[in-house]
Design a protein with these regions (language model features):
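Non-catalytic, mostly N-terminal accessory regions of nucleic-acid modification and defense proteins
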Residues: 1-176
Length: 176
């Protein structure tokens, strides 16, 4: 069982997370217009070590192939989890850290069932997860005005999310 990894130009053993990564790369190319020459996978983003290995971002996207070639800051970091894995808050912070280390403006966490997009809030501590509506398309990447507009489009609550939050607040007030 193998899956083709275009960013590595080779066939890899199919593992659940690898399948998610390759399917998301296809989405980046087909839906967002990114070129494989402006992306990389499993890129080391820091010199520190987590556990036994160094921190590696699943997918890294630059504004252009030229920026990738000259080791400029990344534009978007994507953190993938296997489809069977429930994404936890720690996973969002892992993506945030990778994006901050790589100098990216955006980060995505996905297991394909759930995909959430965040902007990296630079210059503020503690880290804040600010969810936004989408990542820019490749055509928008070099248009600062459009990127800024997208960074300012925060995600609205869905009815279910709002109901859950209201229910939690109600219980806190009732129990105190």
């Amino acid at each position: 069982n193998k899956i083709y990894a275009p960013l590595k130009d080779k066939w890899l053993v199919v593992k659940p997370e690898e399948e998610v990564r390759q399917r998301y790369i296809c989405r980046l190319v087909d839906s967002y217009g990114y070129d494989i020459n402006q992306m990389d996978q499993e890129l080391k983003v820091t010199n520190s070590h987590r556990g036994q290995g160094s921190a590696r971002a699943d997918i890294v996207i630059w504004k252009s192939a030229q920026e990738k070639k000259y080791n400029k800051s990344a534009f978007i970091i994507v953190e993938c989890k296997a489809e069977s894995v429930t994404i936890r808050k720690e996973d969002y912070y892992q993506g945030y850290n990778y994006a901050a280390w790589a100098g990216a403006d955006f980060f995505v966490t996905t297991n394909l069932k759930e995909t959430r997009i965040f902007k990296v809030v630079k210059g503020e501590l503690p880290k804040k997860l600010e969810e936004i509506v989408d990542i820019p398309t490749a055509d928008m990447a070099n248009n600062e005005k459009k990127v800024k507009e997208l960074l300012n489009q925060t995600k609205a609550f869905t009815r279910d999310e709002f109901s859950r939050l209201l229910y939690k607040c109600h219980n806190i007030i009732r129990n105190n």
